[in-house]
Amino acid sequence: IVFVVSMVPIVELRGAIPIAEGLGLNIFWYYPIAIIGNILPVPIIYLFARKVLEWGKDKKIIGKFFTWCLEKGDKGGKKLKESAGNNGIFWALLIFVGIPLPGTGAWTGTLAASFLNIDFKTSISAVTLGVLLAGIIMSLGSKIVAWLGWVGVIAIVAVIAIIVIASILIKKKRK
């Protein structure tokens, strides 16, 4: 179940790891399985996403939209390469995939890289490292929830929020 859930778009390992933790599975068992399941579709997505757009650009119903996607992607990719360079693109993609927020997983990152025409090696390595980072964050978060329960987590988040708000107010007051 962990392997299959980690391959599902949007859910990915962000859903698979908490499920595994909830089932009481061992982290040394579920972490690599979730990672492999999440990374497995990445090269396939990269290689075929752009090809689907190129195939569809001359089709009657979808042609205009697919052409727009390709043109927008090429323009955005060139702009991104000029402003950030390959190194900047690598780190941006890694962070985008690695911070486990809704809609920022391996599928979305790989689709974006493919549409933006970012090279294969940069895309796959950044997404893979991002998946590893997201897996670590989700595993730690799941363990914390398992140890403290939701009430404990909410209490910690509330304390952090109060500290952040207090520090902002103190800085504003000093000015």
How should these model regions be labeled?
Residues 1-40, 47, 79-142:
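Hydrophobic alpha-helical membrane segments of integral membrane proteins
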Residues 1-2, 23-97, 145-175:
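Membrane-interfacial helix-loop-helix
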